[in-house]
């Protein structure tokens, strides 16, 4: 087992493996966990030697023996289908001809994804009420579904809970309603509040990060060749503007996280400004003119921001102060320094004792320990986006918990070795997580002689993905990540199938303000700092908060997070891969045929009767077969030559044949756990049909089902005229009942 980051290392030991002696190209199978980290592909830069995706492709996939790839991800698609294509390209070594020859598609995989993205972009522009999953499914090409069915298997929490018997695989714990905390900054009298600090922050120019803005126009050419960006589409000025924007947003994030982290960042920026003003003063006095462009500290950014190209591409650039309007720059630097000084004074009195947010957390911990929600389970997992905040919490929480309850605490941040109050325990990541979640991490096997037990774990997002910590039943988001998906990923550490806990609790700490105020504030900062020269790689959000519709969407997301724990596929504005593929049904069918090999010999027209539900009303689901196998009515039916239609008792179409995924899901749900005829419903059906001798109503509904196929085909023909990929209007013609045979039907009563 190695880590994604090991791809960029040239030597050393990782997980007990000597990387100097590792033959990367010698593996027949590579399993990539959290594969969405590779979804951006090789990037658009000419110089991509440091790109982890390229390293994986060159060192592991293309080199040595033929390598098969299995990729695991909860979020394979962010808001572009290209994300999925980039991950698939790992499996076919970036050579599309390799996969094109294996797929039963008419177009190449590149064309398929290009058209899918085009359809998705058009769908995104629809009004929210029109932007349904069904609307997107109807515009996607048949070949796209063929690709998905060939290479993906998808399951979600909701899907497993709804369609699978959890008796065999274990159930998910019940999610309690999230607890929302909104502590003020401090309880000191006449102390400042969030809004007062925000007003001061809005006055900052943060020009310390944009020295290129002050280079004389006549001198700019001198730096065009010296900058780090030969062949790269991110200019030095664009890079500086990107860092400036991120730092502006980050000051808000740091304040939301903790007064301690905010104060550290203020100090770091002030120190940079002071050094720069001193350098300018020395130049005026002694003529020493070289100036390094200053980098922001890694500690000041959360994990998502720290991974943007502003930090990973290039190196420092030296600027000659003689080439700059340094006097203007110095004036603006001094103005920022004064604001930072004022902010520092504003929060100077907020020590841990008067830090209301910290004191609220300690009270919350006490309540959980004294009143567990599952038996005697005292475990609590606390997340922060920033390592500085996590360190601050550890220093205060560990002492409090040890002195009051005799329990042990640990810290993992990913930037430094972990810490723990357990004596004699080396605080490596594996040791800490094993002692925190001993059952899920098999502590009895890995550390049989250890009695160490950790009840409180404080962590950054370095463990928000890929870790099973389900021994814990209580998770605290000490700060609300600006990317809402992160919040759900964090909760996924304890919200897992087979958990020994009956209930799990999520606690979110929000800034002390109204949600509308909070959203508008974030928008003001993002809008103010949006620079057109910046490349798209600077965005740390799933959505662009400048568009009014997206602001409303962000508000709705955060509103939901206050009321419920949201599934990850529901939090994305786009489409879930769960809505698209049929692969799981094929696997179910193959499994069924192993124990029922005589399916081919079953007579046509078999039926059964099942109870209706709120979501599946009374009606009939027909399974038909087109007797002319060569005709795929509109080249869109993914289960051709079979056609499924769900018709209501009144002849209304509940679900047409273009959505077989929904129909198959409905059939599975209606029949799940039922292996014998259900007397309560079949008795009534037999009475109505004279024990099957009078099937007039069924015949009429069957005729309506076939009419619906023809009507849907005509609608689809018209639609196809407006989308890329050719029209289906001229492909075939069907006349009615004589084109189909009835395979079976499911009566819903």
Q: Residue spans of the language-model regions?
A:
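Walker B beta-strand of ABC/ABC-like P-loop ATPase nucleotide-binding domains
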Residues: 30-31, 458
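Conserved Helicase C-terminal RecA-like lobe
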Residues: 170-188, 205-451, 747
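Conserved RecA-like P-loop NTPase helicase motor core
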Residues: 75, 353, 398, 402-517
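A short helix-turn-beta junction within AAA+ P-loop NTPase domains corresponding to the substrate/partner-engaging
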Residues: 84-97, 473-478
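Walker B catalytic acidic pair
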Residues: 33-34, 478
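C-terminal accessory region of SF2 helicases/translocases
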Residues: 160, 501-698, 706, 710-749
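Switch/connector loops and helix/strand junctions flanking conserved nucleotide-binding motifs
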Residues: 9-13, 38-41, 78-86, 107, ...
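Inter-lobe coupling linker of SF2 helicases/translocases
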Residues: 1-30, 37, 42-67, 71-74, ...
